[in-house]
């Protein structure tokens, strides 16, 4: 008789500022004497959308079909229109770590906390035409300093994937970096390796219809 598996569910939470790295795909976090690695995104709560990101300023907006994209509405950059400035992004609410309980346990010999590093960026988007109430600068050419008072600003912190030195670069808000993103199955939310065998949940429809993987 085969031994039956017992499924145990534990829930942990982090602030958004911590979770964007600690609960990011392929990263591991340590709790209750265990090392848990994130391997799946909950797609029932995540919001997917295509965003256009300005290479020159911090402006970003959801891509809309038929909308004029010839120049950034904030800074006027013509590079805003480049197709490469559009990325599909997920607003993640919940992730999973599916692991064997015994394998997740750590001891003194295995407690090497090697965390994954990510390419992250905080975008501070301000409508300069309507939300800057006043601005000041030093009247001294040798000491260039100024500041602005703004009524409101939109802050977006984006995780663009694991840090890497090689690959195609993308400029966002004046910063050019390799931004590989994450490969996630759109049917089951399992994190896919950059190279190697695909990884899917037992209930993923790609297991019954493998052609779905080729279609993507």
Regions flagged by a language model, labelled:
Residues 1-216:
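Extended Lys/Arg-rich polyanion-binding regions
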């Amino acid at each position: 008789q085969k031994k039956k598996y017992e499924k145990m569910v534990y829930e942990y939470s982090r602030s958004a500022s911590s979770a964007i790295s600690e609960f990011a795909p392929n990263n591991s976090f340590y709790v209750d004497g265990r090392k848990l690695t994130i391997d799946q995104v909950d797609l029932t709560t995540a919001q997917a959308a295509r965003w256009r990101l300005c290479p020159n300023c911090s402006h970003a907006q959801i891509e809309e079909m038929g909308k004029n994209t010839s120049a950034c509405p904030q800074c006027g950059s013509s590079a805003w229109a480049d197709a490469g400035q559009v990325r599909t992004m997920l607003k993640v609410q919940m992730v999973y770590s599916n692991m064997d309980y015994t394998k997740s346990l750590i001891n003194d010999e295995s407690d090497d906390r090697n965390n994954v590093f990510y390419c992250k960026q905080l975008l501070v988007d301000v409508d300069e035409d309507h939300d800057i109430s006043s601005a000041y600068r030093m009247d001294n050419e040798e000491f260039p300093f100024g500041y602005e008072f703004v009524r409101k600003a939109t802050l977006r912190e984006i995780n663009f994937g694991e840090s890497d030195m090689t690959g195609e670069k993308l400029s966002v808000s004046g910063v050019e970096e390799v931004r590989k993103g994450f490969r996630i199955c759109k049917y089951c939310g399992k994190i896919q390796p950059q190279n190697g065998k695909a990884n899917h949940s037992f209930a993923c429809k790609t297991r019954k219809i493998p052609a779905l993987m080729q279609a993507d």
